[in-house]
Amino acid sequence: MNTLILTIQLMTRIPINKQIDVDDKMLSRGVAYWPVVGAIIGLFQAGIFWLCIHIFPVSIAVLFAVLAELCINGGFHLDGLCDTADAIYSARTRERMLEIMKDSRVGTNGVIAAFFDLTLKILLVTHVAHPVLILILAPIAGKMVQGLLMYKAIYPRDKGLGHSYIGRISLATCLLCTCIGGGVIVVVTVLTMHWWMAAVVPICLLAAFGFRRYIESKIGGMTGDTLGAGSEVIEILFYALCVAATTLDIIK
């Protein structure tokens, strides 16, 4: 239970006032609970959307839902996306890219990445069927792939928060993270008769693998920032696949 509480404290702004003795082993074990945190975030933003849709047009309700996600997670992963974009698209050496990621200032590429991240989320969710369900599941998908991004990866720095996770989680933790996240998505979609969405799970995992290979080719490993970027990329992919299914009348 302490591991779950610690994971919630780390990845959200939910005020849980409990002191926990932290070590690297507990942090790495907590990766198995990341999809659970994704479910909490998803339920929160879906709840905000459900409340707002009774008062505002769909687009405004979606905007509030996206803002709700930022409020509950503090822009934790969005910050990683910005830092990753600034570094990867700087066209510098690996060493300089890693320095750019550590810079607290946001550059042009980071601003562009944040703009398109938020804009795509708002536009995609506005045009998807069953937005409440999709808003719940998308953050789970983003956390589901984290084990794959970390397992046996190289951490290209001597220290940092990512050092507690990257390359340190066990195969069991990686599989638990993937199976819990994927299992929840599959079960929910089957129970709601949207069985086709089960196909989204392997697509997201394959995309995450491709993302990892791309990042590793650029900086020689994975960092905490690239994990956050991966989560955002997979969420957007999840939304995009659902919109495509809506357009093709696969989901109604």
Give the positions of each predicted feature.
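Histidine-centered active-site/metal-ligand motif
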Residues: H77
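Hydrophobic alpha-helical transmembrane segments
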Residues: M1-G74, R92-L98, D103-K252
